Amino acid sequence: MVVDDEPDVEALFRQQFRRDLRAGRFLMEFASSAPLALQRAAEIGDATLILILSDINMPGMSGLEMLPIVRSARPDVPVIMITAYGDAETKRKALEKGAADLLTKPIDFAALRQEIDARLEQAA
């Protein structure tokens, strides 16, 4: 699941992973806010939610505020935070709150694909 309030993010992810999505290798859910992501994480079956990618800076509830809640509800699902601010303090806060990793924008989609592949292998 990708959590980001920017509408262009969904189009970008769908474009970057179009072959995988067309081939049915995995499904990609999108949530435009942290509260929607928490709701979807509670609804999605255990085996089908393998990774959450969340922007940090969102209106209302931030990704960092959502992080401990989603980790408590779904400890089986790693959360990777995405930010335009890759400073050491932001990374420390994200990891402290339970993030598996922190990616900085622009996103390295090749590295992200490797992470998704690893999660798919673990889920199989």
Predicted feature descriptions by range:
Residues 112-124:
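Receiver (REC) domain switch/output surface
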Residues 46-53:
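Active-site beta3 strand of CheY-like receiver
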Residues 105:
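A Lys-centered signature of the CheY-like receiver
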Residues 33-36, 62-65:
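Acidic catalytic/metal-coordinating carboxylates
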Residues 58:
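Receiver (REC) domain active-site loop signature in two-component systems and cognate sites
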Residues 65, 72, 86-101, 114:
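Alpha4 helix (beta4-alpha4-beta5 surface) of REC/receiver domains from two-component response regulators
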Residues 1-18, 28-30, 34, 52:
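Conserved acidic segment of CheY-like receiver
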